[in-house]
UniProtKB/Swiss-Prot annotation:
Superkingdom: Eukaryota
Disordered, as annotated region: 751-782
Organism of derivation: Homo sapiens (Human)
Subcellular location: Nucleus
Ranges of biased composition (kind: Acidic residues): 762-776
Tissue-level expression: Expressed in many tissues. Highly expressed in ovary, testis, pancreas, brain, heart and prostate.
Function according to Swiss-Prot or TrEMBL: May function as a transcription factor involved in cell differentiation.
GN (gene name): PRDM4
GO BP: methylation; positive regulation of transcription by RNA polymerase II; regulation of gene expression; transcription by RNA polymerase II
Domain SET, residue spans: 412-529
SMART domains tied to this protein: ZnF_C2H2 (SM00355)
Protein name: PR domain zinc finger protein 4
Zn finger residue spans: C2H2-type: 545-566, 618-640, 646-668, 674-696, 702-724, 730-752
Length: 801
């Protein structure tokens, strides 16, 4: 009941008569009964049934239990009280009122109410005056009505042009309470004046904004608002020479300040004010104007918000003159104390510190305070922007450093030291590591980016390419110690003597395996396995810079220059290198010192030297195949693009290379013009000749377990074993002939015309030279040129013929 009555919006100034039959003959009473200042007497309470108006309680009584609930019957609050506002008119219930017979209600309470009736009503500013959706719950009219004259202990006139707002100028709504229970807000009974404070015009939209003016500790003399200043003017704060009423000290009150034609000088925090442009009305703002300290000659106002400061220009927030003028933003000085929450505003400087009580509800303000005050002195119980001036600096104890994942994952048998290959950190052995000891897998960041995959510097060892079926799948990047393990610190060997680890891929991962016993106090140095080196297009051995002549080169550039010197040593004399030199005569005068081959130009010889050294820098992007000659790469790319520019004039078959066309034309002529250099045997196809030459140049080391026949390659042995078992899995669908290999079946299909086919020779097949080597059958097998039957030995073929 008490709470409901305290929340009522009571009538404006002007004490109306109470209605009670039990006190109809009582004598007039006044505030002098209570020892208060004299006030006009009032008539006796009239007959029941008339309206009753209850005046507003002053701020000095806001903390006391409401006396109104004592004078009305129980339950009257539920039905209402007759007030001056139309929307709150109610009628008292019929008499009698037995509890009004006491002397308290006859004399004392009417005196209190009559005293309060003489005073101007308190003015309030409440943060809830504007709803979240931006609609004003309370508004100020364009022409607020004048206040009744009120003077206490002399008249103190305010300067012209200053207008205060009372409750009569407020169009209140029934749902809005003007009696909050918040004790931190103080009533303003007179106008507020400030001096030497610039005005601000803020671009912050008032849509969804609630402003709150909070006064703590108002002290001073009473002030009067002249009648001449009661016309509608913007509320200005220009001077603090006129002091506020002392009756408002330590009490709370709220003034609704919403509507058109209202101006306020404000001081804005630089870190928490953002420019608001049109179209932001849907967002909820909560900008509060806090007065954190008020004394006799100083008042401070701060606008705190969670937005950043932007350039402020004069803008109109409403159609009818609501605007804010520019303001100078003050800075924090060292004299400000956070604990007290006091602020001084003077003509020279303005200092602002928000009290901690107001900072608790704003995360952005908390962050701002953390940056403004870095040191908290526990002896002074306050914060300082630097060291305490009295007790000096504090002692900081840092955290224990946390090592990275790469360093923490290092095995106990290994240690990290400076590398001998020039790197900052390398991995060294603390004890003997036996041969065939594996480490891994290598852990790093996986990347599928083509930019990383096509890293041009293949010498760096922090990019590891992973292939699947000859196609680049992803890369492992070992640059971040927190994302990798200790294997990122293992460095690459510079030559064969330094290498003691072999890096190889397995199941999409990289492992290191020792190639020898590694004694203590030795650094682990790796190089790639032979197969992996071929995949990534690097030399098969780390001593790639060691020339065949015995020259050691520290870099590839030096090694390339050294190879050029070998080429110049084979150049012809000046008399033979004129305009009609080898480029025109096509004479192969540039011979390789490592093999019998000769070339028509030094550039061709240079490329040939790179092949001897295992250097294939030109790599295919489609199948990861590498070439030492860029022209070979261009020719190889035609296989992927399907470009065939060389066409046979007899059968309209097309080829990607001219050499393939020439080899194909032999099928139509039947000529065998390819002769072996070691014997007089002739061949129609170049691939057959190359396969034959291997018999003379390479030693067969792979032996058949059934017939002791030797082979050059394992796949040749597998094909040979099928002949022992009688397996001919590749059958022609036209003539039902079977073959040991798919290669021979493919050759047969090119000439097969059915069961009565009797083509003389198989047709040429277009294949890359290196691929044809893999498809070719073992050297010991021969096929019949008459019916394409395959035989494992020359003797069997002769018997067949």
């Amino acid at each position: 009941m008490h709470h409901r009555m305290n929340e009522m919006n009571l009538s404006p100034v002007g004490m109306e008569q109470l209605t009670s039959s039990s006190v109809s003959n009582a004598l007039p009473v006044s505030g002098s009964h209570l020892g208060l200042a004299a006030s006009p007497t009032h008539s006796a309470i009239p007959a029941p049934g008339l309206p009753v108006a209850i005046p507003n309680l002053g701020p000095s009584l806001s903390s006391l239990p409401s006396a109104l609930s004592l004078m009305l019957p129980m339950g009257i609050g539920d039905r209402g009280v007759m007030c001056g506002l139309p929307e709150r008119n109610y009628t008292l219930p019929p008499p009698p009122y037995p509890h009004l017979e006491s002397s308290y209600f006859r004399t004392i309470l009417p005196g209190i109410l009559s005293y309060l009736a003489d005073r101007p009503p308190p003015q309030y500013i409440h943060p809830n005056s504007i709803n979240v959706d931006g609609n004003t719950a309370l508004s100020i009219t364009n022409n607020p009505s004048a206040l009744d004259p009120y003077q206490s202990n002399g008249n103190v006139g305010l300067e012209p042009g200053i207008v205060s707002i009372d409750s009569r100028s407020v169009n209140t709504h029934g749902a809005q309470s003007l009696h909050p229970s918040d004790g931190h807000e103080v009533a303003l009974d007179t106008a507020i004046t400030m001096e030497n404070v610039s005005r601000v015009t803020s671009p912050i939209s008032t849509d969804g904004m609630a402003e709150e003016l909070t006064m703590d500790g108002v002290a001073g003399e009473h002030s009067q608002i002249p009648n001449g200043s009661r016309s509608h003017e913007p509320l200005s704060v220009d001077s603090v020479s006129n002091n506020l009423a002392a009756d408002a000290v330590g009490h709370g009150g709220v003034i609704p300040m919403h509507g058109n034609g209202l101006e306020l000088p404000v001081v804005m925090e630089t870190d928490h004010i953002a420019s608001r442009v049109n179209g932001m009305s849907d967002s909820a703002l909560s900008d509060s104007i806090h007065t954190v300290a008020m004394s006799t000659n100083s008042v401070s106002v701060a606008l705190s918000t969670s937005h950043n400061l932007a350039s402020l220009e004069s803008v109109s927030l409403h159609e009818v003159g609501l605007s804010l003028e520019p303001v100078a933003v003050s800075s924090i000085t060292q004299e400000v104390a956070m604990g007290t929450g006091h602020v001084d505003v003077s003509s020279d400087s303005l200092s602002f510190v928000s009290p901690s009580l107001q900072m608790e509800d704003s995360n952005s303000n908390k962050e701002n305070m953390a940056t403004l005050f870095t040191i908290w002195c526990t002896l002074c119980d306050r914060a300082y922007p630097s060291d305490c001036p009295e007790h000096g600096p504090v002692t900081f104890v840092p955290d224990t450093p946390i090592e990275s994942r790469a360093r923490l994952s290092l095995p106990k048998q290994l240690v990290l030291r400076q590398s001998i290959v020039g790197a900052e950190v390398g991995v060294w052995t603390g004890e003997t590591i036996p041969v065939r000891t594996c480490f891994g897998p290598l852990i790093g960041q996986q990347s599928h980016s083509m930019e990383v995959a096509e890293w041009t510097d293949k010498a760096v060892n922090h990019i590891w390419k992973i292939y699947h079926n000859g196609v680049l799948e992803f890369c492992i990047i070992t640059t971040d110690e927190n994302e990798c393990n200790w294997m990122m610190f293992v460095r690459k060997a510079r030559n064969r003597e330094e290498q003691n680890l072999v890096a190889y891929p397995h199941d999409g991962k990289i492992f290191f395996c020792t190639s020898q016993d590694i004694p203590p106090e030795n650094e682990l140095l790796f190089y790639y396995s032979r197969d992996y080196a071929q995949q990534i297009g690097v030399p098969e051995h780390p001593d790639v810079h060691l020339c065949n002549c015995g020259k050691e080169c520290n870099s590839y550039t030096e090694f390339k220059a050294h190879l050029t010197s070998h080429i110049h040593n084979h150049l012809p004399t000046q008399g033979h290198s004129g305009s009609h030199g080898p480029s025109h005569s096509k004479e192969r005068k540039w011979k390789c010192s490592m093999c019998p081959q000769a070339f028509i130009s030094p550039s061709k010889l240079h490329v040939h030297f790179m092949g001897h050294m295992g250097m294939k820098p030109h790599k295919c992007d489609f199948c990861s195949k590498a070439f030492s000659d860029p022209s070979n790469l261009r020719t190889h790319l035609k296989i992927h693009t399907g470009q065939k520019n060389y066409r046979c004039t007899l059968c309209d078959k097309s080829f990607t290379q001219k050499a393939h066309l020439e080899s194909h034309m032999v099928i139509h002529t039947g000529e065998k013009n390819l002769k072996c250099d070691y014997c007089d045997k002739l061949f129609m196809r170049r691939q057959d000749l190359k396969q034959h030459v291997l018999i003379h140049t390479q030693e067969r080391q792979i032996k058949c377990p059934k017939c002791d026949k030797l082979f050059l390659r394992t796949n040749h042995l597998k094909k040979h074993l099928n002949s022992h078992e009688g397996k001919r899995d590749y059958v022609c669908e036209k003539c039902t002939k079977a073959y040991l290999t798919k290669y021979h079946l493919t050759r047969h299909l090119k000439t097969c015309k059915g069961p009565t086919s009797s083509s003389s020779a198989p047709e040429e097949e277009e294949e890359d030279d290196s691929e044809e080597e893999d498809l070719a059958d073992s050297v010991g097998t021969e096929d019949c040129r008459i019916n394409s039957a395959v035989y494992s030995a020359d003797e069997s073929l002769s018997a067949h013929k």
